[in-house]
Amino acid sequence: MPCVQAQYGSSPQGASPASQSYSYHSSGEYSSDFLTPEFVKFSMDLTNTEITATTSLPSFSTFMDNYSTGYDVKPPCLYQMPLSGQQSSIKVEDIQMHNYQQHSHLPPQSEEMMPHSGSVYYKPSSPPTPTTPGFQVQHSPMWDDPGSLHNFHQNYVATTHMIEQRKTPVSRLSLFSFKQSPPGTPVSSCQMRFDGPLHVPMNPEPAGSHHVVDGQTFAVPNPIRKPASMGFPGLQIGHASQLLDTQVPSPPSRGSPSNEGLCAVCGDNAACQHYGVRTCEGCKGFFKRTVQKNAKYVCLANKNCPVDKRRRNRCQYCRFQKCLAVGMVKEVVRTDSLKGRRGRLPSKPKSPQEPSPPSPPVSLISALVRAHVDSNPAMTSLDYSRFQANPDYQMSGDDTQHIQQFYDLLTGSMEIIRGWAEKIPGFADLPKADQDLLFESAFLELFVLRLAYRSNPVEGKLIFCNGVVLHRLQCVRGFGEWIDSIVEFSSNLQNMNIDISAFSCIAALAMVTERHGLKEPKRVEELQNKIVNCLKDHVTFNNGGLNRPNYLSKLLGKLPELRTLCTQGLQRIFYLKLEDLVPPPAIIDKLFLDTLPF
């Protein structure tokens, strides 16, 4: 098949197709001055998004927008297509045009009817070196000049069907079809054939004006190409499939666990914030119950227990302290006064509040219980040597013996009760005169209260501070009618089922109270308020006081009864002094004189 090559010649701008001259060279080459730069371009500006086709590969303009801003008027360029196996050429044929011919409509010609002299082939270049999917620029340029077309694959024939759907009557790529050339075609030449009338719009013109060019044959030799000014690696089908198969890393899902979605207290999953801090539902409920009930917890270790999802329920004290440490606000928790509406944060104080000491009521009640236990005889060391349950015993013996026994029991209890008072936190810090006044004023009250709590009024057993156990009838002649009031008070006290913690607070309040003649009554009042708050917290949340209304009031109501019993004791001592059967001990006599109201 003869190869005809077109040689470029100069032509004035705007020359019409009829004014062009054509000449054949002796070598069989065909020269034409017809190809003006405008026609050579034939509107195949690859930066135009109209040429791109919707395929499985990324849009062609996506690549071109990043590497070029436009094309200048240049000679026709070559498509390079890396192929595996034997090298083949691409044949460009005319595809019949529809609805755009002004003068005549030529029927499509079959491949056999086309003259061989008009066949033109594109010779593909050798396959480039495989590159990474990143499409990095290689040192050996794949394009010979900036105006060259991008790599095409054989399957891109289907793009003509997509472009035919454009709004304009002519599809630019519809002018071409691609087929493989016979093997052995020289690589150095590029041939192209136009069969039939070719109508290419050069500039924006009215729809009725067109450039009509008869089908001609020309060739573009390789040597006339300009040196490459830009390198761009070829887009291989294998690389494109790898790009499409590669999964783009998606952002973490909204519900995936992260540090922002963990509870600040135990580390469990937390959906939102509660009381100012992102916490889980478990820690939110624990904090709410603790604040609403004003509960006080005790740490059995060193107040540094680990608080996590698995061990958060082991130590309530450390868990609540961590809730406060991470910033949970107690004032936001709804109380009875905020019932029916959400709590709101109070306004910020002008000066930062000083942090309260770590749970002082807990340490106070523990000290009170310890002082009570140390000042009471053990149940295994009680002295039953003088105990007799004989109803006739009150009639036997001398009165002086019973009176002396009465004085001995009082003096024996006095030293034990004083030792108990010295162990009360804060009592030893008071002035010595106030300590003596408080103790002497409350001695008889403490004597009756402790005796009533230890004794068993049902069996008539009275257990004194020194461990001596006597029957109620054995004390009648020494105590007189006072013993009956003590037993009755003991019965009422036993029926209240007071635990040892509440009783320790009641005993301390019986002594730490306002007395006439105190040197520093304010300090006494502060200590009294601490004990009252300690008793209130304990009774309300720790020993079933929630199920018994007015339980705290009933406990505090025992203190006035003790005052009445103390008055009865003073009357008994006064009566024994008047009787003068047995002289009272000096400490009892001083106690009597100091506690007289006149």
Curated annotation (Swiss-Prot):
What does the UniProt record report as the effect of altering C323F in this chain?
In IDLDP; uncertain significance
**Region Disordered: start-end pairs:** 1-22, 337-361
Question: For this UniProt entry, what's an example GO CC term?
Answer: chromatin
Motif Nuclear localization signal (NLS1): chain residues: 338-350
Return the InterPro entries for the record. Answer: NHR-like_dom_sf, NR4A1-3, NR4A2, Nucl_hrmn_rcpt_lig-bd, Nuclear_hrmn_rcpt, Znf_hrmn_rcpt, Znf_NHR/GATA
Q: Give the matching Pfam families.
A: Hormone_recep (PF00104), zf-C4 (PF00105)
Please give the DNA-binding region boundaries.
260-335
Where does tissue-level expression of this protein occur?
Answer: Expressed in a number of cell lines of T-cell, B-cell and fibroblast origin. Strong expression in brain tissue.
Disease named in the record: Intellectual developmental disorder with language impairment and early-onset DOPA-responsive dystonia-parkinsonism: An autosomal dominant disorder characterized by global developmental delay affecting motor, cognitive, and speech domains apparent in early childhood or infancy. Most patients also show movement abnormalities, often hypotonia with later development of dopa-responsive dystonia or parkinsonism. About half of patients develop various types of seizures.
Q: What is this protein called?
A: Nuclear receptor subfamily 4 group A member 2
Q: Which organism is it from?
A: Homo sapiens
Q: What is the lineage of its organism?
A: Eukaryota, Metazoa, Chordata, Craniata, Vertebrata
